[in-house]
Amino acid sequence: MKKSLVLKASVAVATLVPMLSFAAEGDDPAKAAFNSLQASATEYIGYAWAMVVVIVGATIGIKLFKKFTSKAS
């Protein structure tokens, strides 16, 4: 009885240890997905800042144009 219990425990440990090390060393698909999402978000933020500069510049230009045309009239 005691030998079979020791044998079963050693078999269980022998099967669990390689599985745990394989799980720890493998690539995590969720981590890869979040890294890809972060890269895309960073790219889109860069595009957004370019649009902010264009919109603010156009708004200031329109206001200055209105100001100078009203003074010229």
Swiss-Prot record:
A single Gene Ontology CC term: helical viral capsid
Enumerate the subcellular locations listed in this protein's record, separating them with semicolons: Virion; Host cell inner membrane
Q: Which SUPFAM superfamilies match?
A: Inovirus (filamentous phage) major coat protein (SSF57987)
Main localization, broad class: virion
Briefly, what is this protein's role? Self assembles to form a helical capsid wrapping up the viral genomic DNA. The capsid displays a filamentous structure with a length of 760-1950 nm and a width of 6-8 nm. The virion assembly and budding take place at the host inner membrane.
Quaternary state and partners of this protein? Homomultimerizes. There are about 2,700 copies of this protein in the phage capsid.
| Sequence similarity | Belongs to the inovirus capsid protein family.
| Name of the protein in its database record | Capsid protein G8P
In its UniProt entry, the species of origin is given as: Enterobacteria phage M13 (Bacteriophage M13)
> What gene name does this entry carry?
VIII
